[in-house]
């Protein structure tokens, strides 16, 4: 019995140390450069713009604007086809956020950008509310925004991670338990 337990333990350790990699495609997605639906979408977009351009005289401002839009559309599709983005059956690029490092650029930079900007907005809002709470009529200042004060606070908000860390260290970021009101139930 001890030998059997040892073999089970050994096989479990070996399986957990050397797992087989499962290399499956990601939900039927293909590289955009190899996707027929992606090419079809490009042709349909360009054709639609060319039909609109046919309604105007060559060289007229609307025709020139549509020609520029066609060039931008082709450049966008070309950029997607040169990248490692994967397209679905609809021909649209899909972002993969499953932890694979090969798709990190698709999600990490936009994700950090979103977190930074939303943190900036939240930090500036918090700082504004704390600043107007010391005025003689704070409720009115919350409804009717003091634009010069708000702009001043917004321009300093880009360093919100440093400010948040400093307030966290000085115990000014989190309210004390005595300051938090609890409604009786």
UniProtKB/Swiss-Prot annotation:
Entry GO CC: chloroplast thylakoid membrane; photosystem I reaction center
**Localisation per UniProt entry:** Plastid, Chloroplast thylakoid membrane
Extent of the signal sequence: 1-24
What is this protein's function? Probably participates in efficiency of electron transfer from plastocyanin to P700 (or cytochrome c553 in algae and cyanobacteria). This plastocyanin-docking protein contributes to the specific association of plastocyanin to PSI.
Concerning Gene3D superfamilies, the annotation shows: Photosystem I PsaF, reaction centre subunit III
Which Gene Ontology BP terms does the record give? photosynthesis
- Where's it mainly located? plastid
Q: Where are the transmembrane segments?
A: 104-124, 143-163
Keyword check for Heme? no
Q: Any idea what this protein is called?
A: Photosystem I reaction center subunit III
Keyword annotations for this protein, in alphabetical order, are: Chloroplast, Membrane, Photosynthesis, Photosystem I, Plastid, Signal, Thylakoid, Transmembrane, Transmembrane helix
Q: Which family does it belong to?
A: Belongs to the PsaF family.
């Amino acid at each position: 019995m001890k030998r059997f337990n040892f073999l089970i333990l050994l096989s479990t350790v070996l399986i957990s140390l050397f797992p087989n990699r499962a290399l499956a495609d990601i939900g039927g997605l293909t590289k955009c450069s190899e996707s027929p639906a992606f090419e079809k979408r490009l042709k349909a977009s360009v054709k639609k713009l060319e039909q609109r351009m046919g309604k105007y005289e060559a060289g007229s401002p609307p025709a020139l604007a549509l020609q520029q839009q066609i060039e931008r559309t082709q450049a966008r599709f070309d950029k997607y086809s040169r990248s490692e983005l994967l397209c679905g059956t609809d021909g649209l690029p899909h972002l993969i956020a499953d932890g694979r490092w090969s798709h990190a650029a698709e999600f990490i930079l936009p994700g950090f950008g979103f977190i930074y900007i939303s943190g900036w907005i939240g930090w500036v809002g918090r700082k504004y509310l704390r600043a107007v709470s010391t005025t003689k009529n704070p409720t009115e200042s919350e409804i009717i925004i003091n634009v010069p004060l708000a702009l001043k606070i917004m321009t300093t908000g880009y360093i919100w991670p440093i400010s948040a860390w400093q307030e966290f260290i000085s115990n000014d970021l989190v309210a004390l338990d005595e300051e938090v009101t609890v409604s009786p139930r």
